[in-house]
Design a protein with these regions (language model features):
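Helix-start (N-cap) detector for alpha-helical repeat units in TPR-like alpha-solenoids
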Residues: 4, 11-12, 45-46, 79-80
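Conserved structural position within tetratricopeptide repeats
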Residues: 5, 35-39, 70-73
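Register position in tetratricopeptide repeats
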Residues: 23, 57, 87-91
Length: 92
């Protein structure tokens, strides 16, 4: 397995770990795992969007928006982050 595949594998591993923790409402643990996923692959859109949702669920709207805006800039089209950002703007 080459270096790039190992990095992607690690990023996906930590994303799945964070997803599992978010499902059982371990938000602090999910944040740690999702940040680690992004350390391996900053372009992991799923991890970034989930991290935004976790922040939003904790009431940290500004932190959520930061993650979603980065996600939107990485993938402008076909990105659920666009909808999340729009909902925040509509609620304001």
């Amino acid at each position: 397995m080459d270096y790039t595949k190992k990095i992607m594998h690690q990023s996906n591993y930590w994303y799945n770990d964070g997803l599992g923790k978010a499902k059982i409402r371990d938000m602090s643990g999910a944040i740690v795992s999702l940040r680690r996923s992004l350390q391996y692959n900053r372009g992991n859109i799923a991890a970034r969007n989930l991290l935004g949702l976790v922040y939003y669920g904790r009431g940290e709207v500004a932190e959520a928006l930061v993650e979603w805006i980065i996600s939107k800039n990485l993938r402008p089209r076909d990105n659920i982050a666009n909808e999340y950002i729009q909902r925040i703007q509509d609620a304001s």
